[in-house]
């Protein structure tokens, strides 16, 4: 803020609404009437769109309204008056629905007044925040039992009054009584809540959700009535054409007759301009005449209304009457007068004025100021703005209507036929002009709504909607983020010599980036020198800012002039008195010098894509003369995910003291040592430094005094780092035969010089990455041991100073703070660089070679593995390896035809070959290498974690192994070969992509080709997943950005809704809690930690007794007492810790595994020892210090922590769940399914069921067979059809098809599928024939269709998919009534091809799969609306379980019916199903065949009966559990997993309960979260979300802290449903701006404007839109300074 001109006001909230005619006229300075923009001299015309009253037209012109030039004129609105009202295209659907719900006779809603009143009461209560009362008001009618008929039974609101015993008057009287009682209830509820101070005007997610539900129900209720409940009239239906025309469809004959009998007549709303309606509404009576031109005066029905009929050539208007917009408006005006009470609750209205129907129509169109439609000038030519084209068209259409209306009102002699025709033609042209005007208005607001937008050739000018929406729209491109000044961008290059928290700035940036520093006595000399140096010499300055804000540029000044100005920096401005500003205010402000960036300034560095918090950090500037690139330390590479192969980075220079201090103390690099995703370290040394760390700390490295001191000096830089040239050294470890220091002593010396002088040294025990066995069989160099800051044992490698948890640097960070840890990294980096220069490091070919023995091992193993391919193939098809090749090929042929079986073969083959690969690698590396570690530098790199892994070594030295594509082996071509050089269907491993060669000695051409295939797949995956994960992260971000920790430890959304009572359920910060359970570390460093936490000052401020004593009770009796966190806030009560942590501390103190805690006896003797009570107090204190800070944006952190790792995941990863199983969706597709679509129908639903103890394998197998879906085709061996023509003479002839199904033998199908012969018999004679009948009918119908040549939309051509109806208009419509709720807004779905071609790298919109899911959600099957029982009951329709069915069948078998009777009975059943069934038979003895004969007329089209029967067989189900297709036993996850489990494909939880004898009911699990929600409730679903998301990441070994997952799961379920992170989910956000900045801007804008929503700017997005600081982090509180009266000077 400029203190010279402070701004004392800010935007508090934003209210949305709609400008009416008067508002537009008030803000307008001129009516625009001239469609011509410029005259012949290129000057703006009067009354044109560039009229100077609207603002300056070019740079040199002056505004005619405020007389300012183009820099200062704010711009002024104009307006265009339309000759007739036009429909507002964004509100058209809403308006159309209201029209359809209106009775055109009484102009009330067709719904009864009582029901409308109920909705009014509910909405009113919800507006006051009374959710429960809103539910209760529905029951008022039942409890009071007001309306009774003559029998004394309650009368349903909607029941027909004429049928009941009551007369109209009685019902009306009772309805009035009921309404009065409801009103009293509402008034009492509001009064009570006011009294109890419960009223909360704040709109919450829950209230909004409920309100939308009520509104949706209201629209559904009013639009579902055919006859008016109030006056019993039948109103005509309507039909709309596009967004421009509405037609009235005449009443049916029956309804017309009814209306004539009742004598009801519609008033003519066109003829009647009825002043009283307008006065009722609070309008001036003459408002019409002033706003609408003489067109309104035309009586469109005066003589011959026929010209208005059938004007449309479209078939939709056949027999229908075209309605003018005036007529529609007049109907709705009357509705709004009659139903004003409820409509004012639904729609926005001004204070003191009721809601008006005029909001749906445009009479005056506001014209934006010229500065928002600037003309572009090229030389002498002026090009108009593309927006003007739309406005000009409206002007031209308006003028055309005015001239046509004159022609049509000319007096005509009724006898003149020609005159009448002319007038009729004029009418027709007038109507067409009305429609054209409507199209032009539509184009202005939404260019997609205009049908004649000019085809493919020309680009359509964007409408207002297009300007606002999508990534290039106003919201996302110009409000949510902007381009900034004081930024620089360049290539980055590495520099190991600067500090890790510094950034090297090239001089070219240093002289351009400036900071406005106020001049004071303290910095006068510095600022003076800067001004004298000027803009080109560093450190100089570019401008001086005077007290009144004027700037003086130093660019054109000479050194003498600059010196003169520099000397006056403390002199007050001379012309202040005459300036318009107050002298007293400005006298206290300083001059400012825009000085160059200098060493130590904070710069914010950022590398895109900015996926998580550490992608943007603050570094200290260090100007490096002679450089041209940004120089950065290696330790930051991980944070930015940067490398130096040409990456560019952005640099920003904060311009205010607040921003600088936040950068210096919060965003600084040292404070970002731990990543919020998992709490692990992110910064560490890499590559050469790691190798040098290993060499430096080897047991056999010794240094002379010179080397020791030289290394220490180079590392510590005592001259620069504020150590005043002093270095503390250690005595040499070796005195004889010479004086030598060890490498370990150098590390100890570094720590000694870095640690704070008043603190004890570091005590640490950790593991090295290099195992001890690599040095010698019994070496202990694998464990690192520090005692009081001295390195006693162990090698320092990646696990000590790389980005690894619990290593040296991480422990220093925990003990001494981030600054010391940052300095340690810098010092180690310089130390290892210096050592590398002393020692050198290289890698040679000999490091890659195997010795003779190693080569022999490799050769022998490969020789033994040659037959593995044949063995695996033979085993898979159940043959021995010496079986004839022909037999093997015959069996394999079947496998290759079935993709699932082929997948099984691939898995078997891969398993066998991967075993070979592993055995070769294990044998040859490291034992078979020519040079052994540590002298093998390749091994040094891989073993220490510096670069590469064992995979790289093995591919170079051993073999490449099996190549995989999408988890499968290399696929075969049609010829049966994988490449032309192989034999068809070859079983060798090589032909399936196994590469036995190595890079060292070269690979064969075929192997090279396979390797390239696998590489290409990886590249494609990388390219595709960037956009997928980018959009996923954006969806998470927009929903969660408002979630923030409050001062009461709760996590709340920006509307105040509580999402969690404790963040992550224990209130701990992810990064602070990492060391919390490292009890050994805490005990060893007890003294240092006590000093760090300043125990005495903390204990004086908190209660240390209450919570601790309560926690002991609560832990002993958890069912009696609530958890301590629930009762005592952890920030004020020491000992208020989570139960899990308390148990862990207790367990450690009791077991005392490290013998660090003294017993009571020992601590009595020596008071300084660490005893149990001291240790517990320390741990409680550490817990309190690890609490999450209030104001922390945990929602943003959670979304980044899910989004960032998802970019590391492969896109389409499939996990093979065992033979016969479908793949399980994993990776990004699964994440999108859980999080973005919250899908109720997931791609691969499965259940995991644990078998009860004692269930035998045989019973388990039988259970799987019972649950499996069995279709008839699985028991049919072959189908035979005989066709013959029978009968004499052409009239009597017929075609007979004899169908015979040959089944497998009864023993085979009973063993394999556990199915009885009777089941097959019954299925064949019943279900099979029904399905066959349907298939034959469908086939004949299609062939008839083909013959007739007629094309029907519903029957696609061959090879074309039938287009789902929903695709035609992907509007968010729920049922027909939902049209009223939502505008058909398809922001993210339109122009799909355009977005695909652009492939916006990181934030693409929803893809096809998302749209399908969105459509599913839009239907009525929203999870929260699902009737809990209905859906699952339907899932298990058969009233008996499968086992009951079998028992019943067996009983039937015992009551044997004779075979002949069975045959007769089944033939009778068959004839009922198929009238043309002539004969039916079944093998009742052996159950091995079934026959049926079907007769057709001779002229029936030829039927390909075999394929039809095969199709019928595959569709005929013998037995199934609905929803479940397969069941199979689950292979154990590990050797420890001994519990037998089965997996089902498909989910039906209720049906599985039937099998309680086999299945453990407490161990059922499914990956279908929506099913869990329906059956087990919301808490179970919430836990399932956490489990599912974490298992998706678990597959890739990515650690995401459970606190983030629990927050996401809580957010998705805290409303009681399963909310998706998409635009359906954000619908219930209370901030309109937040919704608009996400997707479908105009849909949410329309909604907000119609409802009159208020955005209170509590959401981060909405604050950003209006330019206010966010209310989170440092913005979540204000700082007040105490005002102290200073004594008079």
UniProtKB/Swiss-Prot annotation:
A Pfam family of this chain: RNA_pol_Rpb1_5
Q: One GO BP annotation here?
A: transcription elongation by RNA polymerase I
Region Disordered, annotated ranges = 269-295, 1346-1440
Give GO MF terms, alphabetically: DNA binding; DNA-directed RNA polymerase activity; metal ion binding
Domain of life of the organism encoding this protein: Eukaryota
Residues bearing the modification Phosphoserine? 159, 161, 1438, 1441
Binding-site positions, Mg(2+): 643, 645, 647
Protein name as annotated:
DNA-directed RNA polymerase I subunit rpa1
UniProt organism field? Schizosaccharomyces pombe (strain 972 / ATCC 24843)
């Amino acid at each position: 803020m400029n203190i010279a001109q402070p701004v004392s006001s800010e935007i508090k909230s934003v209210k949305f609404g709609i400008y009416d005619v008067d508002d537009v006229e008030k803000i307008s300075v001129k009516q625009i009437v001239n469609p011509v923009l410029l005259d012949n001299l290129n000057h703006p015309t009067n009354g044109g769109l560039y009229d100077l009253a609207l603002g300056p037209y070019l740079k040199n012109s002056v505004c005619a309204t405020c007389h300012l030039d183009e820099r200062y004129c704010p711009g002024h609105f104009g307006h265009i008056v339309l000759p007739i009202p036009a429909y507002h295209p964004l509100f058209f659907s809403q308006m159309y629905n209201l029209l359809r719900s209106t009775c055109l006779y009484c102009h009330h809603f067709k719904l009864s007044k009582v029901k409308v009143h109920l909705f009014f009461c509910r909405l009113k209560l919800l507006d006051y925040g009374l959710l429960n009362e809103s539910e209760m008001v529905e029951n008022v009618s039942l409890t009071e039992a007001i309306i009774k008929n003559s029998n004394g039974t309650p009368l349903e609101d909607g029941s027909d009054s004429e049928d009941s015993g009551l007369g109209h008057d009685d019902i009306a009287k009772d309805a009035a009584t009921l309404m009065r009682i409801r009103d009293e209830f509402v008034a009492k509820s509001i009064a009570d809540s006011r009294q109890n101070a419960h009223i909360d005007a704040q709109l919450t997610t829950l209230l909004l959700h409920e309100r939308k539900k009520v509104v949706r129900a209201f629209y559904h209720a009013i639009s579902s009535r055919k006859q008016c409940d109030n006056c019993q009239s039948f109103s005509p239906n309507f039909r709309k054409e596009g967004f421009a025309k509405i037609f009235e469809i005449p009443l049916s004959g029956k309804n017309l007759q009814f209306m004539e009998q009742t004598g009801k007549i519609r008033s003519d709303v066109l003829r009647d301009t009825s002043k009283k309606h307008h006065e009722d509404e609070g309008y001036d009576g003459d408002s019409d005449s002033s706003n609408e031109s003489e067109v309104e005066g035309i009586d469109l029905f005066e003589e011959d209304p026929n010209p208005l009929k059938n004007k449309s050539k479209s078939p939709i208007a056949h027999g229908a009457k075209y309605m003018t917009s005036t007529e529609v408006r007049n109907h709705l005006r009357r509705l709004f007068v009659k139903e004003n009470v409820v409509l004012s609750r639904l729609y926005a209205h001004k204070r003191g004025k009721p809601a008006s129907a005029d909001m749906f129509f445009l009479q005056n169109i506001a014209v934006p100021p010229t500065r928002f439609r600037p003309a572009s000038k090229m030389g002498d030519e002026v090009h108009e703005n593309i927006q003007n084209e739309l406005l000009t068209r409206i002007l031209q259409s308006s003028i055309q209507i005015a001239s046509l209306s004159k022609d049509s009102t000319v007096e005509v002699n009724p006898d003149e036929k020609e005159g009448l025709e002319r007038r009729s033609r004029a009418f027709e042209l007038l109507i067409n002009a009305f429609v054209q005007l409507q199209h032009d208005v539509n184009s202005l607001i939404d260019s997609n709504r205009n049908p004649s937008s000019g085809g493919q050739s020309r680009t359509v000018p964007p409408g207002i909607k297009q300007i606002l929406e999508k990534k290039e729209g106003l919201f996302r491109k110009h409000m949510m983020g902007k381009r900034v000044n004081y930024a620089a961008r360049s290539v980055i290059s590495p520099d190991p010599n600067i500090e890790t928290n510094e950034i090297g700035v090239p001089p070219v940036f240093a002289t351009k980036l400036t900071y406005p520093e106020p001049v004071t006595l303290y910095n006068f000399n510095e600022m003076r020198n800067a001004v004298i140096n000027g803009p080109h010499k560093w450190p100089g300055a570019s401008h001086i800012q005077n007290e009144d804000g004027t700037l003086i540029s130093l660019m054109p000044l000479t050194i003498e002039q600059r010196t003169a100005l520099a000397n006056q920096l403390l002199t007050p401005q001379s012309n202040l008195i005459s300036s318009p500003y107050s002298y007293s205010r400005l006298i206290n402000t300083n001059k400012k010098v825009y000085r160059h960036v200098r060493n130590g300034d904070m710069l914010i560095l950022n590398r895109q894509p900015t996926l998580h918090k550490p992608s943007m950090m603050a570094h200290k500037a260090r100007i490096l003369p002679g450089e041209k690139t940004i120089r950065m330390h290696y330790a930051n590479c991980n944070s930015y995910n940067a490398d130096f192969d040409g990456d560019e980075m952005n640099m920003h220079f904060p311009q205010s003291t607040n921003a600088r201090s936040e950068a210096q103390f919060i965003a600084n690099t040292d404070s970002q040592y731990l990543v919020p995703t998992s709490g692990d370290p992110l910064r560490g040394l890499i590559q050469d430094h790691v190798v040098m760390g290993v060499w430096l700390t080897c047991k056999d490295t010794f240094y002379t005094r010179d080397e020791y001191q030289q290394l220490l000096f180079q590392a510590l830089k005592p001259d620069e780092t504020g150590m005043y040239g002093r270095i503390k050294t250690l005595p040499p470890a070796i005195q004889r035969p010479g004086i030598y220091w060890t490498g370990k002593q150098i590390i100890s010396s570094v720590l000694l010089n870095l640690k704070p002088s008043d603190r004890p040294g570091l005590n640490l025990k950790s593991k090295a990455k290099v195992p001890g066995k690599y040095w010698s069989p019994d070496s202990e160099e694998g464990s690192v041991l520090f005692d009081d800051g001295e390195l006693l044992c162990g090698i320092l490698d990646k696990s000590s100073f790389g980005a690894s948890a619990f290593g040296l640097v991480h422990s220093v960070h925990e003990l001494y703070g981030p600054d010391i840890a940052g300095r340690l990294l810098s010092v180690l980096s310089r130390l290892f660089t210096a050592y590398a220069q002393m020692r050198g490091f290289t890698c040679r070919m000999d490091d890659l070679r195997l010795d003779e023995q190693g080569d022999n091992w490799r050769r022998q193993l490969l020789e033994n593995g040659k037959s593995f391919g044949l063995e695996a193939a033979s085993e898979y098809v159940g043959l021995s390896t010496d079986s004839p090749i022909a037999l093997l090929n015959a069996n394999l042929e079947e496998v290759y035809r079935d993709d699932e079986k082929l997948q099984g073969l691939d898995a078997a083959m891969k398993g066998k070959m991967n075993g070979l690969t592993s055995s070769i690698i294990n044998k040859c590396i490291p034992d078979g290498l020519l040079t052994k570690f540590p002298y093998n530098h390749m091994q040094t790199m891989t073993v220490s974690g510096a670069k590469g892994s064992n995979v790289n070594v093995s591919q170079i030295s051993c073999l490449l192994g099996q190549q995989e594509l999408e988890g499968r082996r290399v696929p075969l071509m049609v010829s049966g070969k994988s490449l032309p050089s192989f034999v068809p269907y070859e079983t060798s491993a090589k032909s399936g992509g196994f590469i036995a060669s190595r890079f060292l000695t070269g690979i064969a051409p075929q192997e090279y080709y396979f390797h390239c295939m696998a590489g290409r797949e990886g590249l494609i995956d990388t390219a595709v997943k960037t956009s997928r994960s980018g959009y996923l992260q954006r969806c998470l971000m927009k929903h969660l950005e408002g979630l923030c920790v409050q001062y009461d430890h709760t996590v709340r959304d920006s509307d105040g809704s509580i999402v969690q009572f404790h963040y992550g359920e224990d209130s701990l910060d992810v990064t602070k809690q990492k060391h919390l359970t490292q009890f050994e570390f805490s005990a060893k460093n007890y003294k240092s930690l006590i000093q760090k936490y300043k125990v005495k000052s903390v204990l004086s401020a908190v209660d240390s007794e209450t919570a601790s004593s309560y926690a002991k009770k609560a832990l002993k009796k958890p069912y009696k007492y609530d958890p301590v966190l629930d009762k005592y806030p952890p920030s004020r009560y020491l000992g208020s810790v989570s139960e899990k942590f308390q148990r862990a501390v207790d367990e450690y103190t009791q077991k005392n595994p490290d013998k660090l805690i003294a017993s009571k006896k020992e601590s009595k003797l020596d008071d300084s020892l660490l005893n149990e009570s001291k240790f517990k107090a320390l741990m409680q204190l550490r817990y309190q210090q690890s609490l999450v800070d209030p104001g922390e944006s945990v929602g943003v952190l959670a979304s980044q922590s899910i989004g960032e790792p998802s970019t590391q995941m492969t896109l389409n990863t499939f996990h093979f769940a065992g033979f016969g199983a479908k793949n399980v969706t994993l990776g990004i597709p699964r994440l999108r399914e859980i999080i973005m679509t919250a899908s109720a129908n997931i791609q691969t639903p499965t259940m995991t069921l644990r078998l009860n103890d004692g269930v035998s394998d045989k019973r388990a197998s039988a259970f799987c067979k019972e649950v499996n879906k069995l279709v008839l085709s699985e028991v049919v061996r072959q189908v035979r059809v005989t066709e013959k023509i029978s009968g004499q003479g052409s009239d009597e002839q017929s075609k007979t098809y004899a169908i015979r199904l040959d089944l497998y033998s009864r023993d085979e199908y009973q063993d394999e599928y556990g199915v009885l012969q009777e089941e097959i018999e019954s299925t064949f004679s019943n279900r099979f024939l029904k399905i066959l009948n349907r298939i034959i009918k469908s086939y004949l119908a299609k062939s008839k269709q083909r013959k007739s040549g007629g094309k029907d939309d519903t029957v696609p051509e061959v090879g074309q998919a039938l287009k789902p109806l929903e695709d035609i208009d992907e509007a968010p419509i729920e049922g027909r009534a939902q049209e009223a709720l939502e505008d058909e807004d398809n922001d993210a779905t339109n122009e799909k091809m355009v977005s695909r071609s652009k492939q916006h790298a990181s934030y693409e919109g929803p893809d096809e799969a998302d749209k399908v899911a969105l459509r599913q959600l839009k239907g009525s099957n929203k999870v929260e609306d699902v009737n809990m029982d209905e859906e699952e009951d339907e899932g298990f329709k058969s009233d008996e379980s499968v086992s009951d069915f079998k028992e019943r069948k067996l009983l039937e078998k015992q009551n044997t019916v004779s075979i002949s009777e069975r045959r007769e009975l089944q033939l009778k059943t068959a004839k009922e199903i198929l009238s043309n069934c002539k004969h039916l038979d079944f093998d009742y003895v052996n159950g091995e065949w079934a026959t049926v004969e079907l007769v057709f007329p001779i002229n029936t089209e030829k039927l390909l009966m075999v394929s039809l029967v095969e199709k019928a067989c595959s569709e005929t189900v013998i037995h199934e559990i609905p929803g479940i297709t397969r069941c199979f036993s689950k292979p154990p996850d590990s050797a420890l997993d001994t519990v037998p489990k089965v997996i089902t494909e498909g989910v039906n939880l209720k049906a599985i309960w039937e099998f309680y004898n086999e299945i453990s009911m407490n161990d059922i699990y499914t990956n279908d979260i929506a099913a869990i929600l329906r059956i087990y409730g919301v808490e179970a679903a919430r836990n399932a979300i956490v489990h599912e998301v974490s298992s998706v990441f678990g597959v890739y070994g990515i650690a995401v802290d459970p606190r983030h997952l629990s927050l996401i799961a809580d957010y998705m379920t805290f409303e009681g449903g399963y909310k998706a992170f998409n635009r359906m989910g954000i619908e219930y956000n209370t901030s309109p701006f937040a919704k608009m900045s996400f997707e479908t801007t105009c849909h949410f804008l329309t909604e907000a404007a119609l409802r009159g929503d208020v955005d209170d700017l509590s959401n981060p997005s909405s604050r950003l839109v209006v330019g206010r600081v966010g209310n989170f982090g440092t913005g979540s509180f204000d700082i007040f300074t105490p005002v102290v009266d200073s004594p008079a000077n």
